[in-house]
Amino acid sequence: MMQKNTITVTSDKITQPLTFAFAADFHNGDADEALSLMRGCDAILIGGDLVNRHSRHGWRNAARFLNLAPRVAPTFYNLGNHERLLPDIAEYLPLVQKSDVTVLDDCFVDFRGITLGGVSSARKMPGMPPV
């Protein structure tokens, strides 16, 4: 079940109000339901685990989310452990690369004066190959 929560962050460093939608642990969930909760945001942040590492069954939902999310707002994706542990990650990554999402894998970007970054989950998991 998806739910919408609101957290307000204030800082003298933030010069304009921004609304971020954060999604994590989607695990092949319903793309349309998730995106309906995100309409009107300034950016979508994906914290990983769009897929379930044990099943290719829901990849279609993850691909739909990745293709539709950038139409709602600029989208930034940090791969989670479920993506990293996919036995066939080489087949999943092209789905990600075909979308207009920005992958944040041990890198940072500036978005309207806010630094967004992603840390590779592979760094914490010995033996994980870099993507």
Where are these regions (language model features)?
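Conserved catalytic scaffold of divalent metal-dependent phosphoesterases
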Residues: 11-13, 28-30, 51-52, 83-131
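Catalytic-core regions built around general acid/base machinery
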Residues: 61-72, 95
